[in-house]
A protein has these predicted regions:
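PLP-dependent class I/II
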Residues: 1-23, 27, 31-33, 38-53, ...
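Conserved N-terminal alpha-helix of the aminotransferase class I/II PLP-enzyme fold
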Residues: 83-116
Length: 410
């Protein structure tokens, strides 16, 4: 070896080794969002030229309605692009409470509302300001992927409440009551449900609201899909106005108005909780983008015909995808009562194919069939996959054809 090479090697061996960063204990409590991970994997394959049918992302295939876009454009042209108050301008908070009162019979003031950068931030802020280390939060299974992680990030303990597939995964007041302990601080209800499409009956929801109120337990109502109830008029637990001191409504414009990328959400609740959420928000995102607030006002105060039209299309898409899934050997599927997800049981297919888990099935479907789905493990179950049917009718038919061809190999 030459002297030059020896010197180079010596320098290399004496160079300091980069140590792995020491991350906080808190960040170790959570995982990457499974739905975001699936979206990233699909995007990578698309970039490589793959033609995929994407049942993964829970976002409408519709464009944002014209009048909503026009409101944002007008705001930009008027230079409405500066900071606003953290909780949102008075007009957007007024629009939120008036729309909710009109549609659901609730009773809130603008001071009991905060506008957030997406519904997920409303959930995050609510949990952060209410949950302390060791507090129990009742969470029905299956659950949306982020609930568990956000609770654990706050130091809370998740109390999983199993539901029965034979009963369409519905949550009942009796089941909730059986899960309450002296350490129960909050209950999270998502109706219609992501991922199952289950809808809590109006009677059970009202009983749960009164139960939580009588026990001094906070009830977080995730109403992101509240306008996508298919068999009856939308309803909210916040209509039980005498219990409002223990209710936090978590809302979003993303699904209702096809505004997922706008990041427009809100929370309604008791003034002290909303003030605390605004305080936390003041140290993180601050206000939502000014022009988004103007777009939200247009969405909430303008014609709601677009909401009705999208809901009607989702019903047709639901009927098509459920019938198609039920026709595939090894797959059974409950009938979703709302939202825009099918949550089929694939245990028969796993057994037939020898594929060990829904997660592995998801990988196989992505690479072998070009079909994007989300594994049930992300939602707390071991025999299911989730398909979002908020896609075009053509994509539903193509995706079902690919699924049939994949299953026919076994």
């Amino acid at each position: 070896m030459s002297a030059t090479a020896t010197l180079a090697n010596a320098k290399q061996s004496s160079a300091p080794q980069t140590a792995a960063p020491k991350l906080s204990e808190r960040i170790g409590r959570i995982e990457v969002s499974a739905t975001m991970a699936v979206t990233a994997a699909a995007a990578k394959l698309r970039a490589e030229g793959a033609k995929l049918v994407d049942f993964g992302a829970g976002e409408p295939h519709f464009a944002t309605p014209r009048h909503i876009k026009d409101a944002a454009i007008a705001a930009i042209e008027a230079n409405f692009s500066r900071y606003t108050v953290v909780s949102g301008i008075a007009e957007v908070r007024k629009a939120i409470v008036e729309r909710h009162a009109c549609d659901f019979g609730s009773s809130y003031t603008p001071e009991e509302a905060v506008f957030t950068t997406g519904g997920k931030l409303a959930l995050f802020n609510a949990i952060e300001v209410l949950i302390d280390h060791g507090d129990e939060v009742i969470l029905p299974v299956p659950y949306w992927v982020s609930y568990k992680d956000i609770i654990q990030y706050a130091g809370g303990k998740v109390v999983y409440l199993e539901t029965a597939e034979s009963e369409n995964f519905r949550v009942t007041a009796e089941a909730i009551e059986s899960a309450i302990t002296p350490r129960t601080k909050a209950i999270i209800l998502n109706s219609p449900s992501n991922p199952s499409g289950a809808v809590i009956s109006r009677a059970d929801l009202e009983r749960i609201v009164r139960l939580a109120h009588s026990r001094g337990i906070y009830l977080m109502l995730d109403e992101c899909y509240a306008y996508l109830i298919f068999n009856e008029a939308p309803f909210s637990g916040a209509s039980v106005t005498e219990a409002k001191e223990h209710i936090i409504v978590l809302g979003s414009l993303s699904k209702t108005y096809a505004m997922t990328g706008w990041r427009a959400g809100f929370a309604l609740g008791p003034k002290p909780i909303i003030a605390a959420m605004s305080k936390l928000q003041s140290q993180s995102t601050s206000s939502t983008a000014a022009m988004v607030q103007k777009a939200a006002i247009a969405a909430l105060t303008g014609s709601q015909e677009c909401v009705c039209e999208m809901r009607a299309d989702y019903i047709h898409l639901r009927d098509t995808i459920v019938a198609g899934l039920r026709s595939i050997p090894g797959i059974t599927c409950t009938m979703p009562e709302g939202a825009f997800y099918a949550y089929p049981n694939v245990s028969g297919l796993l057994k037939k194919s020898g594929i060990p888990t829904p997660a592995e099935l998801t990988t196989r479907l992505l690479h072998d069939a070009g079909v994007v789905v989300v594994p049930g493990e992300a939602f707390g179950t071991q025999e299911h996959i989730r398909l979002s049917y908020a896609v075009s009718h053509k994509d539903v038919e193509e995706g079902l054809a690919r699924l049939r061809a994949f299953v026919a190999k076994f």
